[in-house]
Amino acid sequence: MSDPIVPLILSGGSGTRLWPVSRRTWPKPFMRMADGATLLARTLERALAVAAPGAPVLTVTGRDHYFITRDEYAAAAPAAVERHRFLLEPAARNTAPAILLGALDVADRHGGHAIVVVLPADHLIADVDGFARSVHAGAALAAEDWLVAFGVPPDRPETGYGYIRRAGALAHGGFEIERFVEKPDLATAQAYLASGEYLWNAGMFCFRAQALLDAAALACPEVLEAARACHLDTPRDARVIEFAGDSFRAIPEISIDYAVMERAHRRAVVPARFDWNDIGSWTAVSEQATPDARGNRVVGEAVLVDADGCFVQAETRAVALVGVSDLAVIETADALLVAHRDRAQDVKRAVEALRAKAHPSTEHHLTVFRPWGSYTVLEDAPDCKVKRLTVKPGQVLSLQYHHRRSEHWTVVRGTAKVRVGDVETLLERNQGTFIPMGVVHRLENPGSEDLHLIETQCGDYFGEDDIVRLEDVYGRVRG
């Protein structure tokens, strides 16, 4: 096949269904599974398995997730670092804007004949070879200008997924699509399963870039024109492209299913020849762990006494369960979830209640990743806040000051280059400095190993919005 395959990874999420591990700033693609790999890393592995030799892997993600994604890719596939290109969204707008902007980018750089394979970054697929075979079957149909969806043969009457009803058989093991259907009730799902004519809609697609754009011009011209305006409004000569905020937000917020696939004429479905799990609940996560004789599954340190059918994931503390059954217990450093396993889909209701209270556990973990490294909150009191900062070699924090707090820095490991006012000094282990309120300062790691530093803040407000950046190598100074 002469048409090059360009994978388009969609990485994002709101962090509701798998709270407290998944959060707004740390969505599902960054979660680690039982084998220690993140869903994002596994998606990248699949993308590289089907991409044309030397072709880029295009990733659409949020601006706030770029540096984490970049580092995850570098760790997962260091030899492929130069092949990555990123399209950064200033806000989430559902899948149609992301996919149309990706198709416009691919058409510009590789021609409208290039085949785009859309891969959500939060699916678990173990059989990479089977996945690649299915993608190549879909690509063969896409080369004939079909818009291809990948459907998963159902093994149960699932009410949490949309379905695709297949019609007549096509070449390459595909079928024409008769219609897309919404998430059904249980009785309808049972009928779908019994008929053998329905597939789960996996949210994975394959098409020539120009074929999608042509279909969008007919099905949703207003969405395409807004996407095209954003595309033209954005500088595109770099490996990292950040969409202009106003023109991006002008694109209607709609899924690619509603905008294009349900209205298009030449559409096909390829049944998946691989295992598939969208990891959409803690029940799905638990199935990745090995059960004991009583059906309990444990990740982390836990003791279960007279317990049956429970799942425990403990990240920072030992967990003990006594005389209970069918519970999911998820422990993190700052939040604990206890839910009946039959109510796993309702976790998002708890998250909504916490967000209504502006609870920080819905936004971020105690350890927060930044372009330069990370920080972990050790103490958060009304009059002080203590953090442990880890700065990667060669990285530098922004030149900044604060209105409402002073800071004390103490080096625990490594060497720190510190600027306070107009004075620069080098600090070694067990040395420190004081930064008065309102004084410009900067921290840098000039060494070849991680710098570890304890930061003690004193004042009456410690929010991240009390950082006034004057210079920043990561582009975080905005007018």
Regions found by a protein language model. Give the residues of each.
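Conserved N-terminal catalytic core of the sugar/cofactor nucleotidyltransferase
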Residues: M1-I9, T16-P120, L124-G130, H136, ...
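Short coil/turn connectors at secondary-structure junctions
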Residues: S2-I5, P53-A55, V81-R83, G111-A114, ...
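Left-handed beta-helix
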Residues: S2-P4, Q210-T410, T415-T433, H441, ...
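Conserved beta-strand scaffold positions in the cores of enzyme catalytic domains, especially
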Residues: F30, F86-L87, L147-A149, R267-V269, ...
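A residue-level structural signature of the nucleotidyltransferase/glycosyltransferase Rossmann-like core
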Residues: V116, E197, M204-F205, N277, ...
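Conserved core of the sugar-phosphate nucleotidyltransferase
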Residues: A126-F248, A268
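Double-stranded beta-helix
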Residues: E363, P446-G479
